[in-house]
Design a protein with these regions (language model features):
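Catalytic active-site module of serine/aspartate enzymes centered on a nucleophile-bearing elbow/loop
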Residues: 145-146, 151-171
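Primarily recognizes the serine-hydrolase "nucleophile elbow" in alpha/beta-hydrolase
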Residues: 46-106
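Acidic catalytic loop of the alpha/beta-hydrolase fold
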Residues: 117-122, 149-150
Length: 171
């Protein structure tokens, strides 16, 4: 749960299981990642589409749209299923189910992926595998030295140029 949403016991149990594995110095297996991440993606993507529906009723907003940030597995699924999304900036580094890597092969919109190279919680090889899997002909991996909170100030400027190029082309 978040905000006014009720907590979901099964998610709390899965998060506790993940925490236990990580605190013990282990790596979560694919089954745990699937049981934790995929149900969250299944819930979050329709909610995100509902938010996008509501936002696009505002006169100052129009298609095409871009998405930025958040949980990368949600972003991959959303980019795959929602035709209104023309470009995406995604933050690499979280646990990614194999099914999401498979879905990434069908994501063909322009992508800008931010990867903090020294993020202790980052699963760098998974991030690289996911980036490689994307089906987009235009994809950029911006890998920066630094931890989770070490994103350089100019990284936002790069993302702004990316979205300007794809959402507001000149000519």
């Amino acid at each position: 749960g978040s905000g006014e949403r009720p907590r979901i016991d099964e998610f709390d149990q899965r998060r506790a299981e993940l925490r236990h594995v990580v605190m013990a110095g282990g790596k979560p297996d694919a089954d745990l990642i699937d049981r934790l991440i995929l149900p969250l993606v299944d819930r979050a993507v329709p909610e995100s589409q509902d938010v996008l529906d509501a936002l696009l009723t505002l006169s100052e907003l129009r298609e095409p749209v871009g998405i930025s940030g958040g949980f990368i597995s949600i972003g991959v699924r959303l980019a795959r299923v929602d035709h209104r999304i023309a470009a995406a900036n995604l933050f690499a580094g979280s646990f990614v189910p194999t099914a999401i890597i498979d879905e990434a092969r069908t994501v063909t919109i322009p992508l800008h992926v931010l990867l903090q190279w020294d993020d202790a919680g980052n699963h760098r090889q998974v991030a690289l595998d996911l980036f490689d899997a994307f089906g987009s002909a235009e994809k950029t991996l911006a890998a920066n030295v630094g931890g989770h909170t070490g994103v350089p100030s100019w990284a936002g400027e790069e993302v702004n140029r990316f979205f300007t190029r794809h959402l507001h082309p000149v000519g």
